[in-house]
Amino acid sequence: MNTPLKGATLEELNAYRFPDPDSIDERQIAAHAARAKELYETTDYVICAEHPVYGIFELGCWMCGFEDFLYRMALDEEWIHRFFERVLEYQKKVIQRYYTAVGPYIHYTSSGDDFATQNAPFVSPDMFRELVKPYFKERIAYTKRFTKAKYLHHSCGSVYRLIDDLVDCGVEILNPIQPKA
């Protein structure tokens, strides 16, 4: 797996070029919006739009490598905060374009970000609240600026200790509740 920010300095993080949101094919977004509108106006279906960008925590694990990202969460909070700021800066541009088009025609939006193992969250609830929650909450609030849809969040693992925080962030539907987690 390509991990472009593994071991990156703060300067390298700041210089990293995220994909250009202007390169998104507007015709594809328009096609999604047209189909959502058609279903919304002609059926009694519950219409879901998959969130157009990956979860912020998982993205960190993918871009840095799992161990490197968790190490940074424990030892380099400045880097982690800057990472999440940069991710949200990019994601907000995509969110605005996508939900401006499809937002009026959906009943819920589905997002995923795995926060836990089978037994417990990847990080302590306190660390989650300090490092992840503010950005996760901001992302959900920003999404809801463009749609009245309910917000479904998927996380594998035992997120039991984070449920109140997820609700506080704006999660209205939690998937899944793992019976053995």
Regions found by a protein language model. Name each.
Residues 2-181:
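Active-site loop segments of alpha/beta catalytic cores
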